[in-house]
């Protein structure tokens, strides 16, 4: 076949364009994870294994669950069995590892392009995955100083800055890996705009008049300073009774709780049995929160975890603030606020849990 010069040029341009598209799909890019590591990943990622539940939650909200080919074995324990409703795929996905261990054969069977891990994943685990030729991206949702990035209970000069900037960094990192940058920015913008509305309503409350709050976990464990939980309380207008003497996540004694005498006690939704234990145990009856029936089970979105989640900032802090200062939030329908968030980022309706204190 004879081609004229213009036809030949067009054919060459078409061929080169196809080659460029082909090579671009195989090209690499370098990102920096939240351990400060330079990680080279494919230009287009659509097969990831997620061995950290916070990152799995973010991927669902970024509308990237279809890119997930494997998840951690404890995801139901960490996120709650109700989390499965956000995608029918969740209950069918392989589970080649967990927060601190991996089955390398099972992992390789899923052919992932990237594996997400927690910042405290053992170095041996990271090395094992990387030696198999798979890039590892660590997520902490904190902005830490040098030498603190891989710690579960890091030293922090400024908790507010560490978690606020760290959450934004983490969302942007995860969104960048799975090519969902616009969704990541939308999630950040909405989260912090909603939080600011709560801040404005509570800004005139003096520290000395803040409600004394205790976060009750099983076996008398609680969160002190250095965790997002304390910041959640602060932004909701509370004073965390454990913050002054406890760092991180630790067990305390009933005598210590009695001495703190919290006015309100919160329990995370994943520990519903703790509510009746506290309400019915004679040892707790002299505490103000129990006497005044201010012991509340939190809804699933009010994640008072050590690590921040966007829904906790956007609507969880609002829920907590409304419980602590109802007169300041009489115009707020918390279920509507929750539904707005769920429709926007989970693409489903918020259904109040029958056991949680959602009103």
What are these model-derived regions, one by one?
Residues 22-24:
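N-terminal signal peptide c-region/cleavage motif recognized by signal peptidases
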Residues 2-13:
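Bacterial N-terminal signal peptides that target proteins for export
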Residues 96-99, 103-120, 253-270:
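Proline-aspartate-enriched helix->loop->beta-strand connector
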Residues 50, 56-108, 114, 137-142, ...:
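A short, structured surface patch at a secondary-structure boundary
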Residues 76, 228-249, 253:
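Alpha-helical, coiled-coil/dimerization segments enriched in small aliphatic residues
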Residues 49-51, 69-72, 114-118, 136-140, ...:
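Structural recognition of the beta-strand scaffold that forms the well-ordered cores
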Residues 38, 125, 130-217, 221, ...:
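Extracytoplasmic substrate-binding proteins
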């Amino acid at each position: 076949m004879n081609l004229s010069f213009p036809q030949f040029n067009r054919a060459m341009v078409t061929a080169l364009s196809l080659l460029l598209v082909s090579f671009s799909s195989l090209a690499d890019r370098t990102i920096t994870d939240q351990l400060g590591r330079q990680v080279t990943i494919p230009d287009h990622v659509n097969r990831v294994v997620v061995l950290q539940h916070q990152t799995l939650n973010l991927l669902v909200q970024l509308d990237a669950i279809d890119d997930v080919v494997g998840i951690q074995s404890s995801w139901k324990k960490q996120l709650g069995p109700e989390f499965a409703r956000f995608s029918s795929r969740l209950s069918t996905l392989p589970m080649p590892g967990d927060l601190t261990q991996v089955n390398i054969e099972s992992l390789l069977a899923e052919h992932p392009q990237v594996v997400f891990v927690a910042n405290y994943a053992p170095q041996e685990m990271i090395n094992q995955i990387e030696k198999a030729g798979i890039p590892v991206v660590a997520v902490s949702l904190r902005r830490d100083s040098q030498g603190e990035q891989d710690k579960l209970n890091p030293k922090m000069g400024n908790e507010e800055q560490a978690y606020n900037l760290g959450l934004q960094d983490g969302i942007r990192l995860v969104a960048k890996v799975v090519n969902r940058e616009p969704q990541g920015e939308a999630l950040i913008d909405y989260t912090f705009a909603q939080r600011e509305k709560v801040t404005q309503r509570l800004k005139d409350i003096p520290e000395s008049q803040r409600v004394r709050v205790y976060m009750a976990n099983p076996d008398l464990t609680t969160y002190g300073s250095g965790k997002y939980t304390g910041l959640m309380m602060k932004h909701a207008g509370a004073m965390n009774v454990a913050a002054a003497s406890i760092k991180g996540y630790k067990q305390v004694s009933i005598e210590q709780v009695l001495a703190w005498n919290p006015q309100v006690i919160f329990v995370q939704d994943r520990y519903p049995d703790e509510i009746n234990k506290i309400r019915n145990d004679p040892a707790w009856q002299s505490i103000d929160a129990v006497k005044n029936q201010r012991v509340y089970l939190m809804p699933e979105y009010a994640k008072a975890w050590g690590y921040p989640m966007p829904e906790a900032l956007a609507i969880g802090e609002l829920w907590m603030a409304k419980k602590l200062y109802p007169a300041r939030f009489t115009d707020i329908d918390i279920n509507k606020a929750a539904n707005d968030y769920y429709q926007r980022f989970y693409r489903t309706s918020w259904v109040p849990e029958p056991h949680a204190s959602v009103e």
